[in-house]
A protein has these predicted regions:
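Active-site-adjacent beta-strand/loop module that shapes the phosphate/pyrophosphate-binding cleft
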Residues: 61, 71-95, 105, 109
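Conserved N-terminal beta-strand and adjoining loop/helix that marks the start
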Residues: 1-19, 39
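Residues at secondary-structure transition points
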Residues: 40-45, 49, 77, 99-102, ...
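Short secondary-structure boundary/capping segments
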Residues: 3, 11, 25, 32, ...
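The catalytic Nudix box helix
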Residues: 35-68, 108
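Nudix hydrolase/Nudix homology domain
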Residues: 28-33, 98-132
Length: 132
């Protein structure tokens, strides 16, 4: 039997020297911390998917920058994951409103590992730590 494969994009939203982490409020991975984002729809470019997902989840508008890392993670029980992580910033007048997450924190480089990141996000956190 072929395992389900999901392709997602994640926004590493930077504001000053802080990065946004969000805590999932739903599903099997509830309560884990992640970079916000979601599934890429068929025919959708990564930047389009990021802009759409962040608007849906956080009611925020973002500028999508460089791709930091693509993570291939096969450790979840029900699916394999490819996650494309992009450096992003909020647009000038935008702010974050939690619609799907339980909580959010702005983390500095020093506090990046202070939350319980979901397993698939850890490789991206490690890459981000080196990047900052």
């Amino acid at each position: 039997m072929t395992r389900k494969h999901i392709e997602v994009v994640a926004a590493i939203i930077q504001k000053g020297n802080a990065i946004l982490a969000t805590q999932r409020g739903y599903g099997d991975l509830k309560d884990g911390w992640e970079f916000p984002g979601g599934k890429v729809e068929p025919g959708e470019a990564h930047d389009e998917a990021l802009i759409r997902e962040i608007k849906e989840e956080l009611q925020a508008d973002i500028n999508v920058g460089e791709r930091l890392i693509t993570v291939n993670y096969n450790g979840y029980e029900k699916f394999d994951l490819t996650m494309h992580c992009y450096m992003c910033t909020l647009t000038e007048d935008s702010h974050v409103t939690l619609l799907e997450h339980e909580a959010a924190k702005w983390l500095t480089k020093e506090s990046l590992y202070s939350v319980d990141w979901l397993p698939a996000d850890i490789e991206a956190v490690d890459a981000l730590y080196k990047h900052l």
